[in-house]
Design a protein with these regions (language model features):
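Short recognition helix of helix-turn-helix/winged-helix DNA-binding domains
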Residues: 1-65, 74-78
Length: 83
């Protein structure tokens, strides 16, 4: 969704709208990005818990899909977000 008019008309809290625009700005041409919760929070000046709530809002609204990414050693990495 590059035309944000639809987004603004949705019944979403401002935290979710801010995070969606952030993800859209960082997404590649396929609508994929993988910033960490810490990075999103720092860049948007939100707490990590607020960022997590915003991501849940977006997931429930069907605006994002998430996929767990893993490091070579098997440890968790940041989530992949698909818009």
């Amino acid at each position: 969704m590059r035309n944000f008019t639809e987004l603004y008309r949705m019944d979403l809290p401002h935290r979710a709208i801010s995070v969606y625009i952030y993800l859209a700005d960082r997404a590649n041409k396929d609508g994929i990005c993988w910033p960490s919760i810490s990075t999103i929070s720092k860049d948007l000046k939100l707490s990590e818990s607020t960022t997590r709530r915003a991501l849940k809002d977006l997931y429930r609204a069907g605006l994002i899909q998430t996929e767990q990414r893993y490091r070579e050693n098997g440890g968790n990495s940041s989530l992949l977000y698909r818009l």
